[in-house]
Every structure is written in C-alpha cells, then in structure tokens.
Amino acid sequence: MSMENRRGRPPTRRQHLFTKDLKSLMYAFGDDVNPAPDSINVLEEIVVDYINEMCLEAARIAGNRNKVKVDDFKFALRDDPKKLGRVEELLVLQKMIADTRNVMKYNKDHF
C-alpha cells in the first residue's frame, strides 16, 4: 500500500515549524489557550501545503531562470487581489524598515 497523502505526494516528516504561531493565531481567533494537537497538526499541514504549492507555482512561472523572484510570487497571486495586496503592503513595509535602519546606522556612525 502506498504511503501518499491526499495530494498524491509522499508525506513529509513533520518539523512543527509553525506550531507556536498557529497556537497564538488560534487563540486570537477564539480558540482555547491550548488548542487540540490534532487541530494544530491539520492547520500546519494546510499551511505547509499552501507554501509548497505557492513555491512550485512561482518556480513554474520562473521557467528556465535559475532564481525565483518576488515578481513570480506576485504573478502567481494575480487572481487573488486580497493576498496580492497584502504582499504589496509587506514589501512596502520591508522597504520602510530597511530605509529606517540605514538612516539610524548613518546617524549612529556620524553623530
């Protein structure tokens, strides 16, 4: 009997990368302080599957290029304006943080 999950891929070893974050999110959305481990595991599987699918789609879009770029992810999200908008917002915030750090470093070095 084959050991494949519902997506036709072999199951991956769980590393519980998002357990702490998922517990916090679940609590923030009204779950118990200590949610059921099965619930966390299911959500983690969904998150990991989504990330894998997005990375595969971005790599497909990148085609023969050696590197996947942010624009490949943005293109993959083009049909989901809410997610695309959030990506754009996070990119702007990332630039603002980097600029602020540069200013602070400059001020520290020159004053």
Swiss-Prot record:
Localisation per UniProt entry? Nucleus
What would be one Pfam family of this protein?
TFIID-18kDa
Q: What is its main location?
A: nucleus
Q: Give the matching InterPro entries.
A: Histone-fold, TFIID_TAF13
Q: Name one GO molecular function term.
A: protein heterodimerization activity
GO BP annotations listed: RNA polymerase II preinitiation complex assembly; transcription by RNA polymerase II; transcription initiation at RNA polymerase II promoter
Q: Where is the Histone-fold domain?
A: 17-61
Identify the keywords attached in UniProt to this record, alphabetized.
Coiled coil, Nucleus, Transcription, Transcription regulation
The lineage's top-level taxon is: Eukaryota
Q: Would you tell me the Gene Ontology cellular component terms?
A: chromatin; transcription factor TFIID complex
For this protein, the record's CDD domains field holds:
HFD_TAF13
| Task of the protein | Functions as a component of the DNA-binding general transcription factor complex TFIID. Binding of TFIID to a promoter (with or without TATA element) is the initial step in pre-initiation complex (PIC) formation. TFIID plays a key role in the regulation of gene expression by RNA polymerase II through different activities such as transcription activator interaction, core promoter recognition and selectivity, TFIIA and TFIIB interaction, chromatin modification (histone acetylation by TAF1), facilitation of DNA opening and initiation of transcription.
Family of the protein in this entry:
Belongs to the TAF13 family.
What is the name of the protein in this document?
Transcription initiation factor TFIID subunit 13
Q: What is the lineage of its organism?
A: Eukaryota, Fungi, Dikarya, Ascomycota, Taphrinomycotina
